[in-house]
Amino acid sequence: MASIRELHSQLVRKERSAVEIAEAALQRIETLEPQLKSFLHVTADQAIAQAKAVDQRIAAGEEISLLAGIPIGIKDNLCTRGIPTTCASKILQGFVPPYESTVTQRLAEAGAVAVGKTNLDEFAMGSSTENSAYQTTANPWDLTRVPGGSSGGSAAAVAADECVVALGSDTGGSIRQPAAFCGVVGLKPTYGLVSRYGLVAYASSLDQIGPFSRSVEDTAILLGAIAGHDPKDATSLKVEVPDYTQFLKPSLAGIKVGVITETVTDSPAGQAMQAALEVLQGLGAEIREISCPRFAYGLPAYYIIAPSEASANLARYDGVKYGYRVEEAETLIDMYCRTRAEGFGSEVKRRIMIGTYALSAGYYDAYYLKAQKVRTLIKQDFEAAFAEVDVLVSPTTPTTAFKAGEKTADPLSMYLSDLMTIPVNLAGLPGLSLPCGFDEAGLPYGLQIIGNVLREDQVLHTAYAYEQATEWHLRQPAL
């Protein structure tokens, strides 16, 4: 499938109709889903109806937005009115939201065509999409490997050309890590730039919605459509949203790029980053080594803060108002306990228990309060770094995609795949992953580009220049 601009050009020239584009995407989904399992719900009827509306506007001579008629996948933790939203959890089986999330509403108003809801780790808790209660998504580059998580369905769908772009959410790396594993572009915006209204909460001080695509330009276009203040979200920032595509330039002259020394290794992922740095330098960037001494403490701090917030957010799932409820409970308390025991998967229950323990009276200071202090120190490290450079780079992940089942019995090993991405969430910064090479098995590496608060312009500029100087993004999985 072509890029957003290419499809837009075909539509306005009437070379293809929006219905034809939607039907092609739906046919691709039908062909690949038995092996890929990217989607939990395919919304074919809605997609065709939305596409017909775009065609009618074109026929009437109306101007259409760049996203009009563009097939998009939506992570299944974003509320979609009249369409099931399960968060890949048994406890939300059959839940149909009565309202629409702000981001999906904005995309619908722009004329985007939603082809379905994508798979994820249950309640966005995981790094492989193996924690879904319904199915395990495969990596398009190697069907025996994971696509990453928690937004693995969205990343795999974009990589496999089932849709042009997709939405994900990122709490500790859940957009960037699967983007790296699937060889696509994934952006976590500055905290508060994109409304969280209608996003089913995991850890509210960390969650942020962002785009997946196969190019930096498509990422910039999608970000421009979903960003901006929303009075329905108390954490939404009151900022002007620029046309992010104006910052996409091929030269990096005058840009200072900092390499986080704590992420520099001789590993294959580290070597891929070093090769990328040479490209950036050749484009005119000044490369500096920058130390973020508390970077490695992000992982343990995150696994106190995020589960603590999750234990509070997930208290609302009790079998009373919506979703799964056990039958024939003896008492109200029995119904609560059995509903949650049967409705939540093992990883979700593990994180609820960790969070409840960290917030308990005797341990609050030792764990939660200390983790928040570490979070502040990490933020200060980034502030010091951005006083010297414009963007920071690191590998997105320590490795390429691992085999399905390889890490499920070892949660700590699984958690380490988010080692490079978590500090960015703790500091509320924008971070992007894009392809920067392939290993001997033909699996993609990701380069992470981190910006200062609300400096998505510099992140996208750096990413675009690198992308245009290389050919990694042009490779596609053989499906």
UniProtKB/Swiss-Prot annotation:
Keywords: ATP-binding, Ligase, Nucleotide-binding, Protein biosynthesis. PROSITE patterns: AMIDASES (PS00571). It is an enzyme of class 6 (ligase). One of its GO terms (molecular function) is ATP binding. It catalyses: L-glutamyl-tRNA(Gln) + L-glutamine + ATP + H2O = L-glutaminyl-tRNA(Gln) + L-glutamate + ADP + phosphate + H(+). InterPro entries: Amidase, Amidase_CS, Amidase_dom, AS_sf, GatA. SUPFAM superfamilies: Amidase signature (AS) enzymes. It holds the Pfam family Amidase. GO terms for biological process: translation. Its EC number is 6.3.5.7. The active site is at 75 (charge relay system), 150 (charge relay system), 174 (acyl-ester intermediate). One of its GO terms (cellular component) is glutamyl-tRNA(Gln) amidotransferase complex. HAMAP family: GatA. Allows the formation of correctly charged Gln-tRNA(Gln) through the transamidation of misacylated Glu-tRNA(Gln) in organisms which lack glutaminyl-tRNA synthetase. The reaction takes place in the presence of glutamine and ATP through an activated gamma-phospho-Glu-tRNA(Gln). Heterotrimer of A, B and C subunits. Belongs to the amidase family. GatA subfamily. This is Glutamyl-tRNA(Gln) amidotransferase subunit A.
